[in-house]
Design a protein with these regions (language model features):
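N-terminal leader/targeting and pre-domain segments
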Residues: 2-79
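Local sequence-structure signature of Cys/Sec-based thiol-disulfide redox active-site neighborhoods
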Residues: 75-104
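Generic beta-strand structural signal
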Residues: 82, 110, 136-140
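Short helix-loop-beta junction
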Residues: 104-112
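Thioredoxin-like thiol-disulfide oxidoreductase module
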Residues: 115-150, 161-172
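Conserved small/polar residues in nucleotide/adenosyl-binding loops
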Residues: 175-176
């Protein structure tokens, strides 16, 4: 569920000019993996392996996600141009599962433009959209394309999954 906010955003036209399309994001991931790197500053073997697994996950989600008719109709009913900004990183497992689906949903409307921004390259943006004080991703910020007014946010994961994550974290169980 998207949390409605109706306020000005910290995201500027300069941020959007530097943001990526989903295709550019996927190409960046492939390029970095060819160099045994990932997004962000931690290029450890573990982070690169997470990124490699996530590239496979994204391909699977891209191929298997089918939007139901009700959702397509809802997206076609959008009346105003929007920009969906998604804060993400290639090594993030939650992002690998949800970003391709969010892009497919947005693509169902000709009035929605998707822009991806790397969390670690835009701390000033990420810090405006913390989840319980943390830099949790993916984070979707929905903007009115004409006014740049923030219409709502979503993320980092669906509410039931977020509650499970919080419960496991509270019980000190592994959440990685």
């Amino acid at each position: 569920m998207i949390t409605e906010t109706m306020s000005k955003t910290v995201i500027t036209s300069e941020h959007l000019a530097k943001a990526m399309t989903y295709t550019q994001y996927r190409e960046l991931i492939d390029t970095l993996l060819a160099e045994n790197k990932t997004t962000g500053t931690n290029h450890s073997e573990a982070m690169v392996e997470y990124t490699r697994m996530n590239a496979q996950r994204m391909r699977r989600v891209e191929k298997t996600t089918v939007l139901d008719d009700e959702l397509v109709d809802l997206m076609l009913s959008v009346q105003n141009k929007m920009i969906w900004v998604i804060l993400t990183e290639a090594w993030c497992g939650d992002a690998a599962q949800t970003v391709p689906a969010l892009v497919k949903i947005a693509d169902a409307s000709p009035l929605i433009d998707v822009k991806l921004m790397l969390r670690d390259e835009h701390p000033e943006v990420m810090d405006a959209y913390l989840t319980n004080g943390g830099r949790s991703i993916p984070k979707l910020i929905v903007l009115d394309a004409e006014t740049m007014e923030e219409l709502g946010t979503w993320g980092p994961r669906p509410a039931p999954a977020q509650q499970l994550f919080l419960d496991m974290k509270a019980d000190r169980k592994s959440v990685v």
